[in-house]
């Protein structure tokens, strides 16, 4: 198998895999905290890195029929949530390409300021 390439988005507030602490995303990518997954509270994000994806599945959810992929941590394989590929309801189209991370399966951590933000001119 080769080396696993992992990305890091940086930021002041980070979200990581609860199993292996691999960085997944940051607060600036957060769209909503008003979702529910199999383990309870879940968050919707614009961009999440260091994931692998299952095959597409059709699921009927509270908000309608969706085509989704389960998402797993690229480093340890832990299931973390799902990604919306396609929504049949027009009002749900904003979810397409977005990722749900279940709060019980991730951790929040303090990040660090970017170099550009700390450099004075």
Curated annotation (Swiss-Prot):
Keywords, comma-separated and alphabetical: Metal-binding, Zinc
Pfam family, one: Yippee-Mis18
GO biological process terms, semicolon-separated: adult chitin-containing cuticle pigmentation; chaeta morphogenesis; imaginal disc-derived wing morphogenesis
InterPro entries: Yippee, Yippee/Mis18/Cereblon, Yippee_fam
Binding site for Zn(2+): 17, 20, 73, 76
Record carries keyword Metal-binding: yes
GO cellular component assignments: ubiquitin ligase complex
Span of domain Yippee: 13-110
GO MF annotation, one: metal ion binding
PROSITE patterns linked: YIPPEE
Summary of subunit composition and partner proteins: Interacts with hemolin.
Family: Belongs to the yippee family.
Name of this chain's protein: Protein yippee
Organism this protein belongs to: Drosophila melanogaster
Lineage: Eukaryota, Metazoa, Ecdysozoa, Arthropoda, Hexapoda
């Amino acid at each position: 198998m080769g080396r696993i390439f992992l990305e890091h988005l940086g930021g002041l507030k980070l979200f990581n895999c609860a199993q292996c602490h691999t960085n997944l995303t940051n607060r600036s990518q957060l769209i909503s905290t008003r979702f529910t997954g199999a383990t309870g509270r879940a968050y919707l994000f614009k961009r999440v890195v260091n994931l692998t994806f299952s095959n597409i599945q059709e699921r009927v959810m509270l908000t309608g029929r969706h085509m989704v992929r389960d998402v797993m941590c690229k480093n340890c394989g832990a299931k973390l949530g799902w990604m919306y590929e396609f929504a049949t309801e027009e009002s749900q189209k904003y979810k397409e390409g977005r990722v749900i991370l279940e709060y019980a399966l991730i951790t929040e951590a303090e990040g660090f300021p970017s170099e550009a933000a700390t450099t004075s001119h």
